[in-house]
């Protein structure tokens, strides 16, 4: 199977990557079948050989996640929703719903506590013996 992935080159801490087509069993920096582009993550510079990339994709080459993102930005692939993104969004949505429900329950409990406190204060006021006003002389 042919994979489209990044091949690292450059100095330490100043890396750049070549987008290459290679066998899926070959090493990351091994000899590629074909060089298809360039990507510099520091300057966000990207150069793509669009004709060669289209040909490799039509032959069934599978891009890595990073290369897929670069191809989507370059307009060679349509943005697709990946299962991991869907799962992440669903978990976030569930967390938001749970947080909203917890906040609602806390507000309800607080309102009930205030109501019972007010009722207790009113009952205490009714039960307290009324003090007589001192007689005016």
Swiss-Prot record:
Species of the source: Synechococcus sp. (strain RCC307)
Family: Belongs to the bacterial ribosomal protein bS16 family.
Annotated Basic and acidic residues bias: 93-115
Ranges of biased composition (kind: Acidic residues): 128-137
Region feature (Disordered): 93-137
Key words of the record: Ribonucleoprotein, Ribosomal protein
Lineage of producing organism: Bacteria, Bacillati, Cyanobacteriota, Cyanophyceae, Synechococcales
Protein name (Swiss-Prot/TrEMBL): Small ribosomal subunit protein bS16
GO cellular component: cytoplasm; small ribosomal subunit
Keyword Zinc-finger: no
InterPro entries: Ribosomal_bS16, Ribosomal_bS16_CS, Ribosomal_bS16_dom_sf
Composition skew (Low complexity), residue ranges: 116-127
């Amino acid at each position: 199977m042919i994979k489209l992935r990044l091949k690292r080159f450059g100095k330490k801490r100043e890396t750049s990557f070549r987008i290459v087509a290679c066998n899926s069993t070959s090493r990351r920096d091994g000899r590629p079948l074909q060089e298809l582009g360039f990507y510099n993550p520091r300057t966000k510079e990207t150069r793509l050989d669009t004709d060669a990339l289209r040909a490799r994709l039509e032959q069934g080459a599978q891009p890595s996640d990073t290369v897929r993102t670069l191809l989507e930005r370059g307009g060679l692939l349509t943005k697709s929703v990946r299962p991991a993104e869907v799962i992440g969004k669903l978990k976030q949505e569930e967390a938001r719903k749970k947080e909203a429900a917890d906040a609602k329950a806390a507000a309800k409990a607080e309102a009930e506590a205030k109501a019972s406190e007010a009722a207790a204060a009113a009952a205490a006021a009714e039960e307290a013996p009324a003090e007589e006003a001192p007689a005016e002389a």
